[in-house]
Amino acid sequence: MSKRLDKVKLVKGRQWERQDPIDNIGVSTYVLIKDAIQEGRNDLAKDLADYVYFWETKFARDTNFDLIAGWPEFVRINYGEYAEIEDQRAAMIQTRMWKLPFTEKPTVQKREQSPYDYTMGYGWRMLKYHRMGKNDGAGGFTIEEYPDRYEFVWDPCYSGGRPRRGDPVTGTPPRTSPLYTGNQVPHPWSWGKTGVPGYCMHCALIHNIMDVEQRGYLQWASGYPDDPWKPCTYIAYKDVDWIPEEYYTRIGRTKPKVTSTAPRPKDVNKLIRVIHSDELGPEWVPTLTMLKKAIDAGKKKEALKIVDQMRDEMGRISMLIWNWSWMELIIEKYGYNELYHALRSIPCSYALPPAPEEPRPTKADIPNAEERARRGALWGRSDRSGPNADCSVNIIDEPDRVVMELAPCGSGGRGLMTIDTPGMERGPVTGNPWNFKTTPVAHPVAWNKVGVPNYCARCCVHMEMGSLSRYGYLTTVIERPENATDPNCRWFFYRDVDDIPEKYYTRIGAKKPARQK
């Protein structure tokens, strides 16, 4: 019998939480799912699978998506819409590492793949890794076939559409107002529309404009709806020469000369069929669904493999590189002070600022050290911390505080390491080809230390300064190693926040509050 499994306390309320004893909260939920499968505790295994998919992974994941969405909005509000798209382009080039050059007059070059096959390849990654479609991707998506095209229907797009609608799983409202209000003037990179959030603009830029700049053709047309409750679509034409001129005009480009001899069908709006992604083959079935079916069928070996597959899929999205690229851009162009203001303008689920009408919390409102450690452990597990990204943390219960060790941290720390996961192989992101940097001078945004990886400033501002802003106290203290290449951080949760040494306030430019009785 698994002692760690017996300690699991899964609370299923409006939000699902693991309220395990303090000595168990660092254990990977994926390990616990495996324990439950091996012991035949199938209901618990499926409950833990739902929890890790819908709640645990979303904690850091959605915050990282919101962070990506926040950078262009910050630049637009403070430096204008042309600066926003200039920085978007630079971030896309660094994130994607294109091999082909961009040019105003590219050599017109059709892909060897059909538009449908090309979009299908991308769509599979969007479903599995990006969680596009209904119910956070667990409900799949549909493809509508018309005589001249296929429309991939994302209802919603997880990264852009979810923030526009709000999140039905977590119950959070739309992010659009007042945070992500979008452009005020129509541009080619907003499909000629206004009010397009900065995150959504990257689809116009990367999937439309930049593709035309490389090959002369659109890979697909992006269907961005004005109404957030209507789905986004990838419109893949059966022949790229059939793509209407309007899709080029709206992005400020000219349609290439038609070379196809195939006549475009006339009744193009006649729906031929609707295909659900589950019908495309077993590889298209959401992994959560596959896992539950294997558990119900008693196929333990298969289920155990699917658990590893699900954990692996949660890490196959480039949010670390994307966010780090944006941070490097802001530091280089605008400086560390502006990085601070950018981070403070983007809410973080770990330490949300008080709502305007909410009374300022007091020391008495601060959760106890164990509860804060549970939240920290949730972040660490969600952020894929631990050896081999196993989504675990180490918890040490000390007399005056609870210590959480990230060995390594799943984001900034893992970025400093060589990764050999098949399909994701890379060296440290501080080396080629990214060459991300560390702080050259001491600054409060990075604990007044030199040599801190720039990405780590995110934890300093969101976790430490965020809690200070909310409570007037540091409720989480983070100790970043002095060695810039060391990926292992420690978080401290003091039992009495008055016992936090003053140096932890001083290093972020704050003053320690007077001790309260």
Where are these regions (language model features)?
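N-terminal accessory segment detector
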Residues: M1-N488, F492-K517
